């Protein structure tokens, strides 16, 4: 390869294991194979490999087989922290100890697994360009050349501008996404590559291309490549130089492919079935060892293998354990040769230790360029997520317009000064909530960042800093828009200096919050815990901003929080900037006032406002700031310096946390710890029945041996299937006598499709496809990106976008009842979407009860077949086991019409794949029609399929018929094709035949192929005019006529779907189980409520009966409502998991009605919200010293429980309406800020503009605040402090009582010294009800409000159902988003077919 010159691994490096006994560390375990404790069926990972001896030379590719392989790869990759081996064994790279080498040169060890994690909104071009930029410090033109050559080699040039996508956002196909992951790994430029099932999801031709490229790169760069592959053809195996075989605990062989076959077949006497490919043969040996079976069973019939000694004597040896095979290996000549080779290398003076100075640096580009490229990528990935970005922008614009108009032209009065303070506080609080909304998307980024940092594209803190740079830039734009609208609508001071100071402080305060909540996401293990931390931080920021509680009134034990709060410094600076030079008119708060006092000189009056002086009808802003709020204008620039200090500190902590604090990225590990915690707390999780005792690894429940099979497969219809004598044992030997599908529908139906076209935008993904499925097992094949998954989705009525044309017929009749059709089919998706906290049995059971006949005995049959212990949690399954569970979920429904499977064997080893296909074959023999996409099928696997439906890229059918006929068909039209029936795999042959014409020599497009092959055959056009196509049409018509003549309606054989109440009961029980086992979520919710209650209660400890106490009371209630925001975020994260499973899998299968999902989540969430809110009430209410009478406490508690119901239903409404979690978080911030603004706390009702007065009655917070405050302050006696008394001087000859009598009669309040003739001391309020009246509240409204609050809860319920319906049933949101994206064009092209 011309690009190999850019790759510089360690020269002539070799990886040597010399008798190594390897202990696996915790970092390496998790996704690998697990052994199970027979007593409790819980996972117990194997933790040691013994006496591993091999040497992989520079430039070699080694195929590693065996269950510990994945764990071994991870152990080597995490060598610094996980690798542990005991002497005298050793592991060396060149002549360096491997652990030392991995510490000094970690970037030389590259690991790639079967998981594909990418930023979904980046295009393929952006993704690859970023990787190249991080690893190669060369001119852009050369990087582009490398990119184009890599994309061309991997067949991705045609998707250059397409977004990558993921399981939930459509982009490139799954196979193409896998190739992107492989390219990234190539680019990592290491010396030792560990490829862990990296061909999962690739078709055989693409997998072969990958191995060819890998071989070229290995030879050219002299790198060492260890590869684990679950399924592979002999052509792929032949690409490897050596094979390493590992059992559970021991090495069984190392050598070339030919040596391996000779050793096991000739030396040990383990026969190889002629129809087995190499990897099937070797995997079967390993599987029999794992099942602790006798390897002799693989020979003719005896449990003993026949061996010849050196003297020619025939002996027998029985293998009872993997140790027996290990013992044979250790005494073999191959083992001695490896030991001699290793010994020779160790004494070879020419092989020197690796000098780190001779190795490329860990990061090939300087930090400055890392930051540049990461920042560019941060802009690209964020701007690509238009839904989230648009939601934030619209939220800011609407909020600024609404709040600006609410505070429209604030008067220059004392009351107006309160409004200015409220506006400042709201601005600060709004951007705090907006920063809080960024936490979900930060958690979603972490797996990608983890992967790329392990590939050493960049150092963690650089990526964090680049994200921070983008966030600051975007938030600055939002602050500018917000400030311009709000500032001038509210008529704050129209002076440039004042405006820019407002903008400056709000911007830098916002930056502080962005970094603070980013830090929270880095130190919290889960988003639930992050919301717990964020909730407490939010309360501290709001309460100790010195506005809710004035600085001088804070309790000494918490006053220090204010000085650690950036909001306090921003609040002081912004408000001081606004009020310092103002003169506030006091006409609205003069004491006394009214007609009686019109002629009284002002020297006898006073302004009832903090900072007022006797005899003045105004208050200077600076006096109000100093006396009322303890603010001073001279602190403005000091505060700016302090905020800068906070910002630097938060950034430094964030960078430190991202670099040195290892977050809990792995969701599976989190769930696994939840399950362990639950088991430690038995009162939270009662024992679920008896342990699974039926599981027996030595037996399968499956195909009965007595089942007769016969005949040929020449017809396209489902015909009796003949297993040849050589295959008969393979097909039946693994199964016992119990039938598995005695209740499967035996009546044959036919599903036919004619001229199916599917178009998304301007791109046609399926082009004029026709075919049919009756009974039988049909393979849907084609190269990656040909449209296989797309066709399955179209036929199964699962597509929700685009335009479908053509006909789909059931028994010759048009498909009309879509719901009945969905219930009659099963569909196994590529993505294994399950609820992690259910057990295997519970997952199967819910599918069986809701979609099947409820046959619980059949659950054990399927579970045993799939080798899945019933009581293990889904969270404890590795990826292979999750795939098996996905198949089981559909099998237990016993689909009566058709079973669709999308790559059911992807990621499974050869033996597991064969087991699954044999099971599918048995289903087909009993009348089940099965349509199945499959990648890389072996010869023995493909032999079980009756027919093949072959697609080429572009979604065009090129053949439909028996596999044997397919090979003849292609050879008859292309005399350059040669098929050897004895040795060639027919599946590989047909893929190669079509692929070579469509993408010759790895080219991406037909146009490129034609430039290399002028005579390329248009197989789709050839098929349309072929005799075989006419026979298909004829057979279709015959089967449709037979089905119509039978008069059997497939809907009559449907299992009776459970009633709505039964569905609700089942799903509610499932939700309860998942919630009960998610201890992180439950404890976080209780801790947040309890911690917030104590924090608020102690902050407002024993509120005094004075004026400040009145203000504290109303803000106490307001802060109690603020807790709802982080609690809603917790609820949404939890609800999202079940929503994703339902939308992506269960809804498409019509498992249960969509309203059941919403109701069940509400039924489980509400009691949890009520009980946790009870903890908040107990902690907060009684700490504040309010009226503790049973009546008051009881009514307050009752209303707070109703508030808990309100915020719970609000959170569910938003998460079930929003397209994703981050957008829902933005909606939460917007709605909270919107409703809280109109409740009368921030802006007195009397100052509401006429237009917005209706919103006071629309806001639910109005009624909650009024109810809570009224309960607290009703009949509450007020005793003003002397500093709160309004001074006044009575007229000559009058006492204070006489002078103030008329005023008090009209406005209330009391005189402290009514008999005095000098200076009067007037208190504004006598009882709390006076304050309530002034705030437009009344205790008499408590029960009226209670009813209105119920109405809001009811509205949330209605909105939740309506929102879900419009978004996911009627799909209004995608249409709206489509309009938005037309206004804001997307850089990526349309998605391609899968």
Swiss-Prot record:
This is ATP-dependent permease AUS1. It holds the Pfam family ABC2_membrane. It comes from the Eukaryota. ATP binds at residues 782-789. Residues 33-273, 751-978 form the ABC transporter domain. GO terms for cellular component: cell periphery; mitochondrion; plasma membrane. The keyword Transport applies.
């Amino acid at each position: 390869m011309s690009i190999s010159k850019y790759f510089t691994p360690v020269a002539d490096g070799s990886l040597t294991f010399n008798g190594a006994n390897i202990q696996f560390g915790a970092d390496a375990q998790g996704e690998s194979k697990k052994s199970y404790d027979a007593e409790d069926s819980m996972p117990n990972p194997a933790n040691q490999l013994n006496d591993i001896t091999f040497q992989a030379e520079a430039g070699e590719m080694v195929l590693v087989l065996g269950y510990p392989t994945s764990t071994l790869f991870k152990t080597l990759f995490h060598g610094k922290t996980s690798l542990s081996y005991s002497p005298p064994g050793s592991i060396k790279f060149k002549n360096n100890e491997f652990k030392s080498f991995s510490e000094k040169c970690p970037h030389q060890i590259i690991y790639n697994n079967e998981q594909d994690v990418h930023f979904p909104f980046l295009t393929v071009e952006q993704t690859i360009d970023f990787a190249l930029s991080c690893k190669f410090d060369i001119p852009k033109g050369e990087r582009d050349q490398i990119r184009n050559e890599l994309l061309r080699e991997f067949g991705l040039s045609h998707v250059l501008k397409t977004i990558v996508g993921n399981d939930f956002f459509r982009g490139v196909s799954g196979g193409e996404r896998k190739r992107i992951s492989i390219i990234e790994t190539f680019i990592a430029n290491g010396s030792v590559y560990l490829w862990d099932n990296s061909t999962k999801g690739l078709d055989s031709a693409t997998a072969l291309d990958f191995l060819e490229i890998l071989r070229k790169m290995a030879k050219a760069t002299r790198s060492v490549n260890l590869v684990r592959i679950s399924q592979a053809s002999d052509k792929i195996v032949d690409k490897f130089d050596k094979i390493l075989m590992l059992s559970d605990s021991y090495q069984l062989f190392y050598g070339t492919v030919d040596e391996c076959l000779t050793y096991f077949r000739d030396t040990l006497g383990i026969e190889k079935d002629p129809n087995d490919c190499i990897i099937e043969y070797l995997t079967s040996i390993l599987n029999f060892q794992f099942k602790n079976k006798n390897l002799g069973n693989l020979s003719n019939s005896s449990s003993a293998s026949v061996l010849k000694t050196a003297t020619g004597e025939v002996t027998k040896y029985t293998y009872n354990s993997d140790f027996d095979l290990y013992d044979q290996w250790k005494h073999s000549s191959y083992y001695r040769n490896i030991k001699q080779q290793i010994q020779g290398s160790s004494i070879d003076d020419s092989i020197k230790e690796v000098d780190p100075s001779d190795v490329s640096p860990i990061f090939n580009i300087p930090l400055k360029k890392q930051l540049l490229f990461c920042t560019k990528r941060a802009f690209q990935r964020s701007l690509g997520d238009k839904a989230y970005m648009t939601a934030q922008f619209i939220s800011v614009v609407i909020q600024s317009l609404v709040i600006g108009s609410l505070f429209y032209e604030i008067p220059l009065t004392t009351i107006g000064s309160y409004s200015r303070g409220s506006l400042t506080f709201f601005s600060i609080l709004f951007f705090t909530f907006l920063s809080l909304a960024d936490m979900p998307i930060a958690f979603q980024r972490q797996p990608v960042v983890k992967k790329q940092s392990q590939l050493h594209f960049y150092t963690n803190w650089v990526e964090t800093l680049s994200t921070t740079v983008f966030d600051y830039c975007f938030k600055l734009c939002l602050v500018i828009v917000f400030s311009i609208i709000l500032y001038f609508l509210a008529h704050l001071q129209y002076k440039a200096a004042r405006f820019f100071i407002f903008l400056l402080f709000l911007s830098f305060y916002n930056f502080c919050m962005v970094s603070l909540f980013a830090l929270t996401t880095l130190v919290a293990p889960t988003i639930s815990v992050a919301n717990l931390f964020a909730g407490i931080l939010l309360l501290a920021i709001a309460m100790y901003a010195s506005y809710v509680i004035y600085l001088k009134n804070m309790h000494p034990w918490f006053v220090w929080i204010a000085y650690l709060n950036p909001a306090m410094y921003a609040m002081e600076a912004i408000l001081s900037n606004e009020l310092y030079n103002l003169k506030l008119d006091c006409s609205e708060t003069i004491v006394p006032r009214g007609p009686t006092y019109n002629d009284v000189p002002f020297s006898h009056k006073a302004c009832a406002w903090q900072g007022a002086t006797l005899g003045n009808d105004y208050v200077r802003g600076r006096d109000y700031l100093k006396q009322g709020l303890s603010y001073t204008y001279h602190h403005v620039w000091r505060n700016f310096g302090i905020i800068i200090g906070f910002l630097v500190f938060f950034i430094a902590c964030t960078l430190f946390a991202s670099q040195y604090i290892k977050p809990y990225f792995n969701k599976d590990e989190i769930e696994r710890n939840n399950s362990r915690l639950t088991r430690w707390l038995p009162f939270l999780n009662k024992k679920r029945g008896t342990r699974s005792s039926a599981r027996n690894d030595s037996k399968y429940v499956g195909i009965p041996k007595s089942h007769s099979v016969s005949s040929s497969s020449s017809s396209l219809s489902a015909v009796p299937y003949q297993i040849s004598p050589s295959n008969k044992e393979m097909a039946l030997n693994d199964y016992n006598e119990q039938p598995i599908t005695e209740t499967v529908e035996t009546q044959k139906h036919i599903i036919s499709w004619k001229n199916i076209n599917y178009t998304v935008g301007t791109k046609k993904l399926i082009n004029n496809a026709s075919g049919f499925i009756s009974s039988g097992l049909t393979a849907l094949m084609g190269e990656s990106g040909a449209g296989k998954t797309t066709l399955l989705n179209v036929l199964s009525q699962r597509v929700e976008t685009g335009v479908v044309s053509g006909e789909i017929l059931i028994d010759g009749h048009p498909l009309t009842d879509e719901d009945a059709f969905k219930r009659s089919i099963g569909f196994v998706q590529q993505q294994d979407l399950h609820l992690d906290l259910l057990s295997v049995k519970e997952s199967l059971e819910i599918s069986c009860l809701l979609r099947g006949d409820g046959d619980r005995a059949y659950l054990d049959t399927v579970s045993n077949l799939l080798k899945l212990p019933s009581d293990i949690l889904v969270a404890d399954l590795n990826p292979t086991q999750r795939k098996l569970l996905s198949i089981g979920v559909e099998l237990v429904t016993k689909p009566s019409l058709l079973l669709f499977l999308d790559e059911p064997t992807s990621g499974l080893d050869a033996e597991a794949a064969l087991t699954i296909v044999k099971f599918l074959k048995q289903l087909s023999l009993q009348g089940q029609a099965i349509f199945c996409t499959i990648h890389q099928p072996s010869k023995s696997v493909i032999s079980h399929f009756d027919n093949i439906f072959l697609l080429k890229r572009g979604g065009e059918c090129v053949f439909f018929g028996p596999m044997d006929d397919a090979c003849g068909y292609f050879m008859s039209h292309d005399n350059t094709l040669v098929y050897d029936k004895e040795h060639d795999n027919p599946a590989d042959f047909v893929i190669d035949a079509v692929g070579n014409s469509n993408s010759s020599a790895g080219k991406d497009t037909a146009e490129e192929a034609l430039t290399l092959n002028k005579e390329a055959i248009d197989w789709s056009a050839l098929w349309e005019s072929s005799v075989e196509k006419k026979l298909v049409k004829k057979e279709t018509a015959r089967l449709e006529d037979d089905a119509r003549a039978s008069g059997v309606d497939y809907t009559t054989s449907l299992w009776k779907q459970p009633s709505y109440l039964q569905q609700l009961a089942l799903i509610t029980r499932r939700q309860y189980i998942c919630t009960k086992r998610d201890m992180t979520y439950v404890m976080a919710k209780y801790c947040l409520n309890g911690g917030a209650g104590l924090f608020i209660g102690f902050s407002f400890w024993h509120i005094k009966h004075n004026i400040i106490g009145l203000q504290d009371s109303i803000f106490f209630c307001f802060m109690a409502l603020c807790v709802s925001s982080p609690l809603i975020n917790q609820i949404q994260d939890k609800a999202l998991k079940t929503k994703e499973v339902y939308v992506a899998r269960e809804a498409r299968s019509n498992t249960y009605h969509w309203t059941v999902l919403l109701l069940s989540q509400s039924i489980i969430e509400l009691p949890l919200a009520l009980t946790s809110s009870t903890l908040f009430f107990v902690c907060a209410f009684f700490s504040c010293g309010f009226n503790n009478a049973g009546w008051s406490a009881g009514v307050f508690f009752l209303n707070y429980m109703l508030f808990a119901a309100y915020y719970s239903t609000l959170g569910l409404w938003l998460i079930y309406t929003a397209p994703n979690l981050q957008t829902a978080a933005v909606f939460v911030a917007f709605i909270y800020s919107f409703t809280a603004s109109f409740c009368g706390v921030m802006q007195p009702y009397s100052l509401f503009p006429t237009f917005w007065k209706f919103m006071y009655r629309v806001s639910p917070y109005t009624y909650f605040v009024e109810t809570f405050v009224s309960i607290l302050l009703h009949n509450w006696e007020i005793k003003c402090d002397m500093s709160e008394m309004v001074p006044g001087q009575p007229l000559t000859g009058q006492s204070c009582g006489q002078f103030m009598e008329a005023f008090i009669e009209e406005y209330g309040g009391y005189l402290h010294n009514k008999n005095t003739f000098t200076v009067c001391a007037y208190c504004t309020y006598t009882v709390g009800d006076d304050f309530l009246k002034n705030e437009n509240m009344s205790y008499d409204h408590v029960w009226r409000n209670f009813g209105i609050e119920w109405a809001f809860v009811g509205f949330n319920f209605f909105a939740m159902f309506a929102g879900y319906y419009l978004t996911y049933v009627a799909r209004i949101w995608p249409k709206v988003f489509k309009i938005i994206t037309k206004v804001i064009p997307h850089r990526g092209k349309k998605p391609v077919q899968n």
